[in-house]
From Swiss-Prot:
Transmembrane segments: none annotated. The active site is at S69. It comes from Alcanivorax borkumensis (strain ATCC 700651 / DSM 11573 / NCIMB 13689 / SK2). Its main location: cytoplasm. The lineage of its organism: Bacteria, Pseudomonadati, Pseudomonadota, Gammaproteobacteria, Oceanospirillales. PANTHER family: PROTEIN-L-ISOASPARTATE O-METHYLTRANSFERASE, PROTEIN-L-ISOASPARTATE(D-ASPARTATE) O-METHYLTRANSFERASE. This is Protein-L-isoaspartate O-methyltransferase. The gene is pcm.
Amino acid sequence: MDIQLSGIGMTSARTRDRLVQRLRDAGIQDERVLDAIRNTPRHLFIEEALAHQAYDDTALPIGHGQTISQPWVVARMTELLIAKGKPRKVLEIGTGCGYQTAVLAPFCDELYSVERIRPLQDLARKRLLQLGLAKVQLKHADGGFGWTAEAPFDAILAACARVDIPEGLLSQLADGGRLVMPVGGDRQQVLTVVDRDGDQFRSQTLDSVRFVPFQRGVLR
């Protein structure tokens, strides 16, 4: 995906370049990920009233008690997910507004994304189609169950926090695959990476983060 935007203010190349430099200074090293952040128009994924903050490195509300993750978190999770090589098939839990989905799309052949809140999924679908990302498969469902019909996945990214990792997601991770998600309660969460080797799962905890909680059921 290469979306060229021009102009001044919130959508200018200079504004987006400043964000990329902040992410680089904050430790994001993969230039492919930085390019994806630069080329993904974040202002399209938030309310117009907040558009002046679109390229700040901060989380923003998107309604229904949910947020669009700060760009550093999106970049970091993407960087971790592709560190072992390009995954062919990826599952995302928590489509939200679709921003993380759009950043992920260039790095895999097949992308499946589950969202439990119907209005958010509908908006994400429109935005992704607007960006030419028709290949992304979206599903309105409880993310705790993953997407059994399309499993296994080479990589799984969850954009919501739980105190543990759902067994349903681990079982859908392919041998040699990687899962990235925040783990913890309301007060403390850490970005966690799980690598599968046969029936063994090796995990490592990395950065402190703050995500909305993993919730069950669906909302229409």
